[in-house]
Amino acid sequence: AVAEAHVPRSIRFKTKPQIALEQIRAAIKANVAPGTVLMDASYGTNSGLRRAITGLGRSYVAAIISTVKVRLVRENDPKPKRVSVGALARSLPKHAWRTITWREGSNAKLRSRFARVRVRAAPIRGEARFAEETLLIEWPTDESAPTKFWLATVDHDMPFRELVDLAKLRWRI
């Protein structure tokens, strides 16, 4: 089938995350100004890709799916239990949520309800421990459950609105 399609023998199959990582490495090699890597959930859910981007010295804001497992970072709990980001979001107290407006839309200001917490991606047994990250969660008031989740390695002190704006920036590309 490959020969019939006239695909050169030198071309090998690569996953989308592998291709993305090659593109990021090429940008670094070409001295493209460093910025935060933005990923949708098809890329962001891949822990290997996130780890590789961190290894290249780049920060990211990566959309993930609700079943991704994390451990909540707490000072008094050295080994918190693994929990899905969806379950963690539903367990947060009311005061953890803030309504944030991130930009003007075509008809109105874009706003929703968000929470952010410090987590570590919960590694698969035997995998090296992940660094602390920010979990950003969106739960619009008119929804029965949280709708969007991101893991971010940006500066922990980044203003909340700025973090939301960065997460939502991917939609403008």
Where are these regions (language model features)?
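Polybasic low-complexity intrinsically disordered regions
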Residues: 1-66, 76-77, 151
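Intrinsically disordered or highly flexible coil/loop and linker segments, enriched in small
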Residues: 33, 172-173
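An anionic, glycine-rich sequence signature occurring as long contiguous blocks
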Residues: 1-13, 61-172
